[in-house]
A protein has these predicted regions:
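Cytosolic nucleotide-utilizing catalytic cores of signal-transduction proteins
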Residues: 1-108
């Protein structure tokens, strides 16, 4: 069960899973079309970057890779999705999309 104080985006995704899944496929479509290893690497990087407060350095420590590797992967997500991680709306859309994908996978 998702609680609001855990993460508001997770609550939104859990409250309307079909819509959240549709948004996730719209936002992350090109990423989801990649092979499993690359897709998971990029989704893990975005998710970890969020958990690290948007810090490539902190995300790199959590992922056991160089911060430039994190930045490279994030640029790849930006290129594939057409969304800039410096634009607040795009960040919110990507955050919701990643959480929706994770919830969808957990339910399977």
């Amino acid at each position: 069960m998702a609680r609001f104080d855990d993460n508001p985006l997770t609550v939104v995704a859990a409250a309307a899973p079909e819509e959240a899944g549709r948004v996730a496929r719209l936002v992350l479509g090109p990423v989801l079309a990649l092979g499993a290893a690359e897709r998971d690497r990029l989704l893990d990087t975005v998710e970890t970057w969020f958990a690290a407060g948007g810090s490539a350095e902190a995300a790199g420590r959590l992922l056991y890779c160089h911060p430039n590797t994190v930045r490279y992967r994030l640029r790849k997500v930006e290129a594939l999705t057409g969304r800039s991680l410096s634009a607040p709306q795009a960040v919110a859309e990507l955050g919701l999309a990643v959480r929706a994908i994770r919830l969808e996978a957990a339910e399977k």
